[in-house]
């Protein structure tokens, strides 16, 4: 009997020790498109796990187009679902309505908030709730091929979208490249981001007297420019099927003189190992309709804790690490840091002076896409109608009126 008691006690102590040393397992959802690469996120996570051996992070990567639906579909999974998710600036209204993310307002100190760019914080806040930490501070820039512009005899950078089109026409006429412009116009959120960049540059907003409006002069001007650039042979028609990576590859291959894309393309297009135009890449704020004006879309994203997570403290520990200033500074070549003082760091600035100069202008004029709990439905309609225009199936006026009608029915 004594041996039996001692045996049970030993087993209990072994089980307790095993329980005490067992790592908490987190499930984290990321995307495989733009900003940080999958290999970079894995490297960040491995460093976190090394510093925190009691936490194990299981990573899942999906295309951006699948990210939203993955988060929504997992809401009933409870502790078996995701703990940490990457979310876009356009989803907080919907995620608040359906309680998909935990409010972490109490976890972020006032000191941290003061050190983060306001535009980045806005990405994760809705109706007074903070749904995560900003992680990707991003917008779209106008990239240009310096060698092509020089060969065309273009000595000054375009200051307006009209000048971009004029320069593109010169480049085409001189047969330097067949299609000087390339965009992300596939029927996806990328199309909405390009459209929003143009609307911003033309001085537009999406709300008129508190109501959504897509038939404003700025909106119609944006859509007409998109269509005319195709009709005039300036935009590569394949743009209607392109996402951001397609744009990067086309530009890096020397198949375009101008491209609209996120931050991550700057250093990748300047990398001789994966680009034929390394050293020829220029970057500037997307222009507007008058010299001195710029346009930009808020393409920032945050990391949040799923409502069903049973490991909120460890999830926050991981998020805090991933969004920390040292980690962001170390990976600043693919996504600029959310921390203000990072831009005084010589390592962050190195070889990125042109990018950061452009960011200084663009990040201050970012236009947010409409904040509505029904954003996914609205975006789907907008994508469809824009594609109708780009393929010649509808006029800009008719297409945007159709979007207005759909927007009026949103809850």
Identify the meaning behind each predicted range:
Residues 88-141, 163-167, 179-180, 191-194, ...:
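Hinge/lid segment of periplasmic solute-binding proteins
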Residues 46, 50-51, 130, 150-152, ...:
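Extracytoplasmic/periplasmic substrate-recognition and gating elements
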């Amino acid at each position: 009997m004594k041996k039996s008691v001692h045996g049970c006690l030993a087993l209990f102590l072994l089980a307790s020790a095993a329980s005490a040393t067992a790592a908490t397992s987190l499930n984290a959802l990321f995307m495989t498109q733009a900003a940080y690469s999958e290999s970079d996120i894995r490297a960040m996570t491995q460093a976190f796990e090394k510093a925190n051996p009691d936490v194990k992070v299981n990573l899942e990567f999906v295309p951006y187009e699948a990210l939203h639906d993955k988060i929504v579909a997992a809401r009933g999974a409870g502790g078996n679902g995701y703990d940490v998710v990457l979310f876009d600036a356009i989803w907080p209204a919907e995620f608040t309505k359906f309680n998909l993310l935990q409010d972490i307002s109490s976890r972020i100190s006032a000191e941290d908030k003061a050190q983060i760019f306001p535009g980045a914080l806005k990405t994760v806040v809705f109706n007074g709730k903070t749904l995560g930490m900003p992680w990707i501070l991003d917008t779209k820039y106008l990239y240009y091929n310096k060698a092509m512009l020089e060969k065309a005899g273009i000595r000054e950078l375009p200051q307006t979208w009209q000048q971009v089109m004029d320069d593109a026409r010169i480049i085409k006429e001189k047969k330097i490249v067949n299609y000087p412009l390339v965009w992300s116009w596939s029927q996806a959120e990328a199309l909405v981001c390009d459209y929003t960049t143009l609307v911003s540059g033309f001085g537009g907003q999406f709300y008129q007297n508190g109501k959504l409006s897509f038939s404003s002069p700025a909106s119609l001007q944006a859509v007409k420019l998109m269509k005319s650039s195709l009709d005039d042979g300036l935009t590569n028609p394949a743009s209607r099927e392109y996402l951001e990576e397609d744009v990067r590859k086309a530009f890096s291959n020397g198949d375009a003189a101008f491209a609209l894309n996120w931050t991550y393309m700057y250093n990748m297009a300047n990398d001789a190992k994966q680009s034929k135009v390394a050293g020829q890449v220029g970057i500037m704020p997307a222009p507007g309709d008058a010299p001195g004006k710029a346009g930009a879309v808020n393409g920032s994203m945050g990391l949040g804790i799923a409502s069903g997570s049973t490991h909120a403290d460890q999830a926050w520990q991981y998020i805090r690490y991933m969004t920390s200033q040292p980690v962001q500074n170390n990976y600043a070549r693919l996504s600029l840091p959310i921390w203000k003082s990072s831009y005084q760091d010589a390592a962050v600035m190195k070889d990125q002076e042109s990018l950061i100069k452009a960011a200084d202008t663009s990040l201050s004029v970012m236009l947010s896409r409409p904040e509505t709990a029904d954003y996914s439905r609205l975006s789907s309609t907008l994508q469809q109608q824009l594609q109708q225009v780009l393929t010649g199936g509808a006029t800009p006026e008719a297409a945007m009126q159709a979007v207005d009608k759909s927007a009026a029915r949103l809850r």
